[in-house]
A protein has these predicted regions:
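Short, Lys/Arg-enriched anionic-surface-contact patches
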Residues: 1, 42-66
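Short amphipathic alpha-helical segments
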Residues: 7-9, 17, 25-37
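Short alpha-helical "recognition helix" segments of helix-turn-helix
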Residues: 20, 83-86
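Short, basic interhelical loop/turn and adjoining N-cap
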Residues: 26-27, 86-97
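Short Lys/Arg-enriched helix C-cap and helix-to-coil transition segments
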Residues: 46-50, 107-120
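Intrinsically disordered, low-complexity basic tails/linkers immediately adjacent to helix-turn-helix/homeobox/MYB/SANT
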Residues: 54-65, 113-134
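Short, amphipathic alpha-helical "recognition" segments used to contact nucleic acids or chromatin
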Residues: 64-79
Length: 134
């Protein structure tokens, strides 16, 4: 559910937002709302950053190539944050932060997990001219 909210932006920031919105073919309010959402999530969960992917904006463990949902699966599969951190060779603090994010946004993690487990044929349509090994 959304609620209207008025916001004043500096002229330069508004111009950049409008340019980005035109490039993506979305209303500036949609892009702005996404940035506010991601910004508040990042401030509350500093171990997480957002990146653009063919499937849309996705939460990653900061400074790694690991999507948060993958980190959660690794924590489960290795039997805890410390064991997963040793296996993945990343700080346990980052994985613990990703775990906290996943606990706050379980529906998002479930959707990302489902998207990440799509057949390679589906992914090949999203990322044309890319070779996936069988």
């Amino acid at each position: 559910m959304t609620r209207p909210f008025s916001l004043r932006l500096e002229t330069g920031a508004l111009g950049r937002l409008e340019r980005l919105a035109r490039r993506r073919g979305l209303p500036p309010a949609t892009i702005g709302a996404a940035y506010v959402d991601e910004g508040t999530r990042t401030d509350l969960h500093p171990s997480v950053e957002f990146r653009s992917t063919p499937a849309g904006r996705t939460a990653y463990v900061r400074g790694t190539r690991l999507q948060v949902w993958m980190a959660l699966d690794a924590i489960r599969d290795f039997g805890g944050v410390d064991k997963a951190a040793r296996a993945l060779r990343i700080p346990a603090l980052l994985l613990a932060g990703a775990q906290n994010y996943g606990q706050e946004f379980p529906e998002e993690m479930a959707a990302c997990r489902e998207e990440g487990r799509r057949p390679l044929e589906d992914i090949a349509r999203l990322v044309p001219n890319h070779c996936f090994l069988p």
